[in-house]
Amino acid sequence: YSKATGTLLVNENSNINTLLDLKGKHLGIAGGVYDKTWLLFRAYSKSKYDIDLKDIVNPLFASAPILYKKMQDDSLQAAINFWHFNAKLESKNIKALIEISEILKELDIQKDVSFVGWTFDTKFANENKDLINAFLKASKESKEILKNSDEEWNRIKEQMSVKNDKEFEALKNGYKKGIIEEF
């Protein structure tokens, strides 16, 4: 469905410029200890610095909305959150420290990877192949429309409940970055 996933965000005034600057600090993580983004960040730090990120930070596992609010009120200096919360935060005074694309490059992963997808019960899938194929086709077509049509984005803008144009643009661009071109 999408290659959009977590980015490690930091407050611009935090003086955090690399993963190593997180030593001894709290790092908010949406999900749990087995969250795929957290595991990828750990693999990245091991590959780049020969250090497991879990050994230098104080991980705080919490829900995405809580981390979003903690980053907004500056009570948390760094967090790995879901893409749409990150997009909203990046429209504020918060910057990306490391994006998933940088991690994949470091780990020598060259192709698009789907981080978000659908699962179907095997029996249901076998009994409803046409329905599932139609669903997947509609999903692909809708992504193509949203990838290429500002008019369509403007049509759905009100339904997105964005607070301002900057947040709208951040969500739109984040969604487009998540579209898988080749799988």
Language model region names:
Residues 18-21, 45-49, 63-67, 100, ...:
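A short alpha-helix capping/helix-coil boundary motif
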Residues 23-26, 117, 175-180:
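Flexible glycine/proline-enriched surface loops and loop-helix/loop-strand junctions
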Residues 65-156:
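Pocket-lining segment of extracytoplasmic ligand-binding domains
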